[in-house]
């Protein structure tokens, strides 16, 4: 973790964003029943810093399924290890596109 900190000693925002992309991507791949690629991250803002040692919890919620795209909202909460009180530290919407084996966008089969 010290490698994942910014000059202020807080967790680097890029690390947190990568964890969010993984959480959203897991849901998108399940919905797509296969490969899904991130095409955009929307309206992300950091509300509070995350300290080294904080317990970080991510919640991914399916927002919308289009013909080839999937929108997932991710909320991130952090809780200091010595506390029972967590707080929301960031959230964002991630948009994915379902891909076929050649890496081309494909329709999502909602019937399966």
Predicted regions and their residues:
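Bulky hydrophobic/aromatic packing residues
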Residues: 15-16, 59, 77
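Hot-dog-fold acyl-thioester-processing enzymes
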Residues: 1-40, 97-112
């Amino acid at each position: 973790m010290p490698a994942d900190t910014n000059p202020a000693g807080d967790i680097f925002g890029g690390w947190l964003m990568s964890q969010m992309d993984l959480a959203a991507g897991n849901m998108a791949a399940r919905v797509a029943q296969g490969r899904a690629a991130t095409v955009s991250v929307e309206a992300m803002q950091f509300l509070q810093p995350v300290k080294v040692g904080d317990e970080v919890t991510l919640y991914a919620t399916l927002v919308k399924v289009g013909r080839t795209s999937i929108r997932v909202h991710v909320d991130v909460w952090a809780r200091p290890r010595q506390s029972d009180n967590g707080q929301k530290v960031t959230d964002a919407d991630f948009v994915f596109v379902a891909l076929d084996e050649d890496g081309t966008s494909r329709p999502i089969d909602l019937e399966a």
